[in-house]
């Protein structure tokens, strides 16, 4: 499956996203020829841009890594540690502390664009991916530092209804050939969002944060993909977004490119004039001189144009399912015995389409991997990442000791020699601590 990056270098933590693929250990999906072809294509795409889009070139260090073997091929040598040269490229093996995903990663003296092998050959997905991830490597240079923000509002019935309506209105705006129809659809999209912000006051800052990060990355990928049907493909992409089960970390992949393309039409110099603090929807409203209503009447009138009643019925049914899932997650990850791993400063990778907000406690990731000083915690079934990203919690019931550390239902802990699992704060809980030095 294709991968997308959710967040990259955040403070001292390296964060990446991935859609995990099943592969037998030792079965390589990486070869020099395909990696070289990807490097050449990425170079061609970023060279064609000539730094016009963001004022900096997206060309630079890139590596493609196989998650099964941790082997990689890169287009440049390392700075801190030389790599093995093989023709025009370089080879090596990534340490366990480096997450393998579609991401930007700081390692061996450079900031690299990293891609998971095999890189898709489907177009325009391949070109979009190459430029999306290349943008993440340079985003700090253009004043858009990587950041994360939880989106609990997008796990609620009202939040999901309003977002799905917004996606439909954005698709209609992009698809419209009549300027009046486009303007109306844009106003509708902004109405749905304004209505959501009234009900969830924290949502605007949180959504703006992710759209400046993943949204702009996806916009850049599409903008530089040289796809002659880019708008039509973006409309199809928004249609797929209407069917997403979890929006908490994936919504900006849909809204970001849509608002970016609409801004290209409404205000072609928006990227130059942007002060980086204003949200994309607010910038679009200002460019078009729109006054956006946020009341129930405006929401209902706009919603009637996008089958709001059908969406509301679907989301009411999903809300019942979601409540049952939240109760089960709380029972296993909050009320029951747990292993709590300290993850401040850790490296992460996770799947943005399998993220469930759990009230104020954080987010439950269906798939997540954390690498820290103590070792690696690999979770394939629900790990609770705290809101401040300091703790990763898994259900401890049924866990057993292994030679490497511990194994539980859907997770495995590999401990470095200086660390051990010890009893936690509550009876039945466990945590990870550095071993006490042996007595002399």
Model-predicted segments: where are they?
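Bacterial N-terminal signal peptides
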Residues: 11-21
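Short pre-active-site segment immediately N-terminal to the catalytic Zn-binding motif
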Residues: 115-129
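Active-site recognition of the HExxH zinc-binding catalytic motif
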Residues: 128-140
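Active-site-proximal alpha-helical
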Residues: 201-231, 238-300
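Non-catalytic terminal regions of proteins
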Residues: 272-440
